[in-house]
Amino acid sequence: MPCESGGLECATIMAPIDYADPEAGATELALIRKQSSGRAVGSLFMNPGGPGGSGFDLIAQAVDFVANDTLQSNYDIVGWDPRGVGRSSPVTCLDSRQLDGYLYGVSSNPVGSDGWFDERAEAARGFADACARNTGALLGHID
C-alpha cells in the first residue's frame, strides 16, 4: 500500500473484533514500517500509548526521534493504529459541529450548580449514545 511519507511501507491487516469469538467479525488495522538501514535482526513495534495515540503517525512523523540510528540499522521500525484509532476502524461519535457544541457549548446554568451537572450528565450520555450508534459492535471491543 502506498504511504504518505517517502521511504516507508504501509499495509493493513485484519484482526478479530473479539479475540474470544473470532467468528464475530474482523476489523482493519493500519501499519507502517521503516525498513532497517542495515541487516535487520527483527522488528521493533512502537506505539505512543494513550488511549488514542497513533503509532502510524508516530513512525510517519517522528521515526528519527523515537528510534536512534543504532535501532534503525538493526531493526525494522513498525507502528500501528490500534483498533478504534486513526486509520484503524476509528471510533466515530459526533461530527465536527456536534463535537464543538458538546465541548464548547454554553450552559444556561451556573457552573457547579445542580442544573449544570444535570446538563453535563445528559450531554455525556448523548455523546456515549452517539459513539455506540455511529461505531457499532467494534466499540465494545476497543482495548
Pin down the residues of each PLM region.
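Gly/Pro-rich cap/lid or specificity-loop segments adjacent to the active site
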Residues: 1-143
